[in-house]
């Protein structure tokens, strides 16, 4: 099994080593399944693409688990049970047997490296696909060889053709020299092994790995807004991931150890109530309301407790303000020019599930934040963005408009994949 698909996204051409390539059947392609491992839940989706852009979800499974923190799972048995449960639910609802899944990789288990490369073509001639492959492979050789990591995908950020910058694939262009900046995404081997151990009980294999942030960013942020660096802020339950995306590649990735859990934890400590009661208060909270002289009754196993709405507001807004400051500083560290007013999208359920959360963050950061989760008949809330982003990414990869061209180049791609595999086995 190969876990290092080689992707070229610049011209919508994506070649991967997924075990089951897409098939067109009656206007739709063969269903694909993804497994999205979040910081508090696991989501399995089975869907297919219709009419090029539409996605039909045949089945979905969602299971909560203990989560992960600082790049480590808090309870592997809890994760194991959640993976098995959500795949079973998806199979039952879709009435399809899932044999393999595309696995999303959270930022905590991913590593990003940007490397450039240049090739001289000698006398001026047409750039061929093989030249682009060689560019990407040369840039990969500059990446750090760290034990315990495997390549997920490599995506060109931009090309330089005889000194002229271009985001288009240079195939067929006449040039003497071609350069490229390439985004290489790696996945921690231990992450793959842990998930595969759970899937082994079901007879399911991992067909490919996809960066959760890349799939989500490409789905949410329009192409024209990714011509210059754009930002995706995913505020989850245990952490906040910040990704910088340019064209169809990630150029920056960072994680902050703050999410929806910390809001509830602060309430639990500050109000001296159990986490369950704190979660209830958090979910009912609305930013920017005048809570003077109002109280709320929190029900616990030991009875009821009356607390001041002002106290709840103070605790939540203090944590939200702190998170906003951390996000701003992290974006600046990643090289984002905030004065240029970049496109910034927000997803995840850690803050957006609280009413008024987006407006609070927008005002705190003084940036035109956007929330643009595509409408779906179900699971349309922002905490499912990464799952739908992965499904969208995989389905489009399998239904490339240049499918016939990809088939003709299978041998070339397979040879390159073998070179990449050998590179990491040295």
Each predicted region: which residue ranges?
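Acidic, glycine-rich loop-and-beta core segments that form the ion-binding/anion-interacting portion
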Residues: 221-290
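Glycine-rich phosphate-binding "P-loop"
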Residues: 310-322
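A short acidic Gly-Thr/Ser loop motif
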Residues: 35-41, 105-107, 232-239, 245-248, ...
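Residue-level signature of catalytic and energy-coupling elements of molecular machines
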Residues: 35, 44, 103, 199, ...
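Glycine-rich phosphate-binding loops at beta-strand->alpha-helix junctions
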Residues: 286-289, 339-360
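Short, solvent-exposed amphipathic alpha-helical segments in soluble enzyme
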Residues: 50, 225-226, 247, 360-366
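Nucleotide/phosphate-binding catalytic cleft detector across ATP-hydrolyzing
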Residues: 1-41, 46-230, 274-276, 288-313, ...
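Conserved phosphate-binding/catalytic loops in two-lobed NTP-binding clefts
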Residues: 129, 362-388
